[in-house]
Amino acid sequence: MPTINQLVRKGRRSQSSKSKAPALNYGYNSMKKSQVNNPAPQKRGVATRVGTMTPKKPNSALRKYARVRLSNLIEVTAYIPGIGHNLQEHSVVLIRGGRVKDLPGVRYHVIRGALDTAGVTDRKQSRSKYGTKKPKK
């Protein structure tokens, strides 16, 4: 615990919080070949690998994921939500922040229904989250 004199001299420093989706905080300046601070809610990227991985201990499944090289040249792992997908290598995808609790190292989600990613077929509820159009009557 600091003394009164130490507090008078230095004061309290407020803690800075770490970003939960750090790859969305940067842009890339190709002229200077450097990262620039350019925060964005989503980023576009190209899928370099699409596959499945198994979740942490109490759960059991084959979760679909894509390794994505973003427009700022950072490579991240993104989860593909919903049942079935049409992604393959070199597909252009849009990602957003949001981790998957039982997949270590997965901090991003692929946005369904944007760019090359198709929406989930035959989905009736929560359609907006999965990029599905309203079904015809």
Swiss-Prot record:
CDD domains: Ribosomal_S12. Gene3D superfamilies: Nucleic acid-binding proteins. Residues 1-24 are annotated as: Disordered. GO terms for biological process: translation. Keywords: Methylation, Ribonucleoprotein, Ribosomal protein, RNA-binding, rRNA-binding, tRNA-binding. Belongs to the universal ribosomal protein uS12 family. Part of the 30S ribosomal subunit. Contacts proteins S8 and S17. May interact with IF1 in the 30S initiation complex. PANTHER family: 30S RIBOSOMAL PROTEIN S12 FAMILY MEMBER (PTHR11652). This is Small ribosomal subunit protein uS12. The lineage of its organism: Bacteria, Bacillati, Bacillota, Bacilli, Lactobacillales. The gene is rpsL.
